[in-house]
Each structure stands twice: as C-alpha cells, then as structure tokens.
C-alpha cells in the first residue's frame, strides 16, 4: 500500500509538472536561465517522529531543516523551476542525506521521470554526504546511478573523480567539479584534478565558450575568518584555486555546503575575477534556491523560495490536520518554526565545555573549567526576559553598570535566532550601530561578568586568550592588550572590553560585503586578462593594504578601550 501511495504521488507530481512544460519552451527569451539548488539531503521518511504529536518537530535538530518534508520541498522546487522557464537545473551536491544506494536510486528515478516529462536537463555534482553510504567503489557507483544527469551529456569526464565538462546552450560550458574525497567531509582539488580542470577550461575558451563552474565546497571565503571559524567550510587551498579559476576564465561558480546564501568575489593578480555564488540549503528556512539568467550584458542572480507544497502525497504520514495545513500552505512559517526548534537544540549542544575546547584546539583544564561555567550560565540567561523587573537581563545588567538598548526582542534566544536567520538568508547587515549588534555585545558582556564574577585576572586573561585562539591565533600585540584590559577593569568586563575584542569579529561575519547575496546583477563575461607587472603590483598592494588595515583597526580598538 505504501509503495502504491508513493508511486501515485510521483505520478501526480509529474502530471502537475506537465502543465508547466509549455511555459518552459516559451520562457527562454532573455538569456540562458538556470535554476540551482543545493544541500537537499533527501532521505526516505515514511512516518514523522512521535515527538511531533507533543507540539515539537521530529526533525534532525542539528540541520535546522525540513528533513521529514525533504522530498515534498524538492518536488515543489523542481516544479517552480520549470514554471519559471529554467532551461537547466543544477544540483550542487548533498542530494542525499546518508548517501545510500537506496536514497540515490530514489532521487535518480524522480529526476529521470522529471526530465522525460519536462525536457529540462538536470546536472549534478556529489557532495560529502553523497558518498557516505557508498562503501564499495563510491565514485563509480555514483556515476552509474546519475549517468543521465550530466555524465551522458559530457564530452569529457575525469575517470578518477566525478568531474565532467558539458556544453550548454548559448555558448556556455559547464565544468562540474567533484572535489570530494569519499569518507571525508573536506573538499580538495589535487594536482591531477587541477590539471584536468585547467586543460578543459583552456580547451573550452579556445572554442569561444563561456565557463560556468559547479562544485560542492565554496572556493571563495565569504568572510575573512571563515577558514578558522567554520571547519571544512572551504575547499582546501581555496585562495590559490580561486585565483587560478579567475585566470582560467571560470568567472562564475555555483557552490553549496555552507547552507547559507552568500556571493563571494576574488580578484587575481592579473585583475581577473571569480564570483562564488553560494547556494543555501533548500531545506533550511527560508527554503531558498538560485534562479540565474545569463544575459549578454549582465548576469542576473535572483533568490526564489519554496512557499507551498505542490504535492502533499509526498509528505510522510503522521501529521495532525492543523500541522498538515501549515506544512502545505504556509510552508515558510512552518520552516521558520522548525528552524527555531532546531537552533535551540544546536545551541544547547554547542554550549559544551569539551566541544568548545576541541573547537579552539586547547586541551587545558583551566580553560575547560571556565568554559563549563560560561556554558551553564549561557543556557540559563538565553531564555530570561530581556526587559523588566525581577529576574531579567536588564536587572542583572544594572549590577555591572550596563544598560540595554531598547528593542522589540523579548529574550536573548529570540535575538540569536533573528541574527542566525538573516545570516542564512543572506544580505546580512548588522553594523556596529545596529540594535542587534549593540544588544548582542551587551548580552555577551553580561554573560562574561555573570559567569566569571569573582575569578582572578589570570582566569579572565586565560579565557580571552582562548577566544583569540578560536579566531585564528594571537594577532600581534593582543596578548599584552588583553592583559592590560583585564587589569584595568578588574572584575568588570565592560562593554568597552567586549566591543574592542568581539566587534571586529562580529562585523566581519554579520556585515555583508559587496556584492549582495540575494538579488543582484553581476558583470557580463569578458575576455581573460593576461595581466602585466603594473596590474599585478597594484593588486598586490591593494591586498596588503586591506590586510594591515584590518589588523590595525583591531589593535587600535583594543588599546582605545584600555585608555578609556
């Protein structure tokens, strides 16, 4: 019965897709249109977790995602892409959650039926999850299962990886790059694969083709401390690879893995540019994907969202009527609720002394004891009311001569959730003057005072040094400056201390740099620049100047706090 139900759901889904087939053919005016999704993490879920019946969400809390509803959300994305006139659909890795042959066969069967009915070609690359369950000959097995989704259209395939090159309409060529090492979450392009990429890129440009790249791991950092703060979030040796891509003419690369919408840019010494268009997870709030139009005079990048479930029969069993109505018709609100539920679970697991010590690479009992206290207090404070009398953050703040800026946020968790959602959605702009940054810095100052009250100056210095190590090690002079700050303020972590230490880091992550992340027009393709000594020298000095400005602003902020 269950198999029949799922088969019926698939048929109905494709019947709906047929209704948009005519749209696809007529919507190709206005350049090459490509719809791109990533990190779909599809798995077979027959029945939702029993916890749902108690008002909770039976989802994997660590992923902040609609894991139970994955297939239904994915189907809605495919239908929406067809209706919008996509010529091609790109899937940038982590198609499956566990990487089993069963999951891949299910996905492949759906894609086969979709292609046959709509005529829209689908191209895939593997992500780290896609090799998890393929224990025997994973590269070959993946290629066999997805042979019709890129490989059969390719004119060149790297046999040692699942990288391939395929010509698209409009004079474009796709370089699909498999930088995954099976059994490893890291992304890496070795010497042999890089040589293959270089050969394909040069051959394609010699034919007058314009290159579009796709791989799972980002190839450009989206903020300066990303490599240190988020383990395996970038392909190894990303900076060297990204500038190489730029000089090869790979001007646009679609990537996933980070589960957030970002567009990064890198410029080579020869003044060539690569844009890394980060594709968010389709299952995380706000259920977003990229819809990109490659035009003669520009590249239009637009964010689109799944707002409803097109085929409820693709959902698992177990919802009550109210929940089913929300899932299908108000999918965004449902996704936001799941996000909040999952974020709380993630926060509680992250606030663990052993985990934090491992994160910063410090196996030190002194640091561990400090972390234990901070984690315990953080879990308590995050749910206290921010404002009012009684046991509130505002009342505790007065004890340390701190005041909270007025805001509409009710708790620290509500603030944390709001910041995290905007970060995942893209175009984050929490500057130092924003109420979110001001309130967040004060909440952190309160946490540190509340947690480390009565501890010695040495303990405070130890804690701050540990935090410095977490963000890439000591910057010149910071150890001396941190000691001076703690000695000056004694038992109080004033807002000046926290601002001087954390504000540059938080702004680096939470203030988006150009170009925008969500809806932006990017430059059209241009001839590859060979570069000369003048352009190389200017680019070098520009990079050096920016680097030293960041260090100077950081140190200046710390010493200015000491002088106050």
Give the label of every model feature segment:
Residues 12-16, 20:
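Hydrophobic core
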Residues 27-101:
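N-terminal active-site segment of His-dependent metallophosphoesterases
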Residues 82-88, 173-175, 184-275, 380-387:
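His/acidic metal-ligating clusters that form di-metal
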């Amino acid at each position: 019965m269950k198999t029949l139900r799922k088969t019926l759901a698939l048929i109905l889904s494709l019947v709906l897709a047929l209704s948009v087939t005519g749209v696809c053919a007529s919507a190709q005016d206005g350049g090459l249109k490509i719809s791109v999704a990533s990190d779909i993490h599809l798995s077979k879920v027959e029945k939702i977790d029993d916890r749902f019946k108690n008002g909770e969400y039976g989802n994997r809390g660590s992923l902040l995602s609609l894991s139970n509803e994955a297939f239904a959300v994915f189907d809605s994305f495919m239908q929406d892409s067809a209706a919008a006139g996509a010529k091609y659909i790109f899937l940038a890795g982590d198609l499956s959650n566990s990487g089993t042959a069963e999951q891949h066969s299910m996905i492949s069967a759906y894609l086969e039926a979709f292609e046959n009915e709509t005529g829209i070609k689908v191209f895939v690359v593997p992500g780290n999850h896609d090799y998890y369950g393929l224990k025997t000959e994973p590269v070959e097995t993946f290629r066999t299962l997805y042979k019709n989704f890129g490989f059969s259209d390719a004119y060149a395939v790297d046999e040692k990886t699942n990288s391939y090159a395929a010509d698209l309409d409009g004079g474009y060529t796709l370089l699909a790059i498999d930088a995954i090492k099976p059994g490893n979450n890291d992304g890496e392009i070795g010497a042999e694969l890089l040589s293959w990429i270089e050969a394909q890129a040069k051959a394609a440009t010699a034919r007058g083709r314009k290159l579009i790249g796709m791989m799972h791991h980002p190839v450009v950092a989206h903020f300066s401390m990303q490599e240190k703060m988020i383990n395996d979030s970038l392909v190894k040796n990303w900076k060297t690879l990204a500038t190489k891509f730029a000089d090869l003419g790979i001007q646009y690369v679609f990537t996933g893995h980070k589960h957030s919408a970002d567009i990064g840019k890198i410029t080579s010494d020869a003044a060539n540019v690569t844009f890394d268009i980060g594709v968010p997870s389709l299952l995380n709030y706000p259920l977003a994907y990229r819809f990109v139009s490659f035009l003669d005079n520009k590249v239009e990048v637009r964010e689109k969202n799944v707002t409803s479930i097109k085929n409820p029969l693709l959902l698992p069993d177990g919802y009550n009527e109210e929940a089913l109505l929300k899932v299908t018709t108000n999918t965004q609100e449902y996704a936001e609720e799941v996000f909040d539920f999952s974020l709380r679970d993630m926060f509680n697991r992250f606030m663990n002394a052993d985990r934090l010590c491992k994160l910063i690479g410090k196996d030190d009992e002194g640091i561990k004891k400090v972390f234990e206290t901070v984690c315990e207090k953080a879990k308590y404070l995050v749910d206290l009311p921010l404002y009012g009398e009684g046991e509130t953050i505002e009342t505790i703040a007065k004890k340390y001569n701190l005041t909270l800026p007025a805001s509409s946020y009710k708790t620290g968790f509500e603030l944390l959730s709001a910041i995290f959602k905007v970060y995942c959605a893209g175009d984050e702009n929490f500057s130092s003057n924003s109420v979110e940054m001001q309130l967040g810095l004060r909440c952190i100052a309160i946490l540190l005072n509340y947690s480390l009250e009565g501890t010695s100056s040495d303990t405070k210095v130890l804690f701050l040094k540990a935090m410095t190590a977490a963000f890439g090690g000591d910057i010149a002079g910071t150890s001396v400056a941190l000691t001076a700050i703690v000695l000056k303020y004694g038992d109080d972590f004033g807002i000046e201390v926290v601002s001087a230490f954390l504000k540059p880091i938080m702004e680096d992550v939470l203030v988006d740099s150009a170009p925008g992340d969500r809806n932006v027009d990017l430059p059209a393709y241009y001839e590859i620049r060979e570069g000369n000594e003048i352009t190389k020298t200017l680019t070098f000095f520009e990079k050096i100047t920016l680097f030293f400005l960041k260090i100077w602003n950081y140190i200046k902020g710390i010493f200015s706090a000491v002088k106050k």
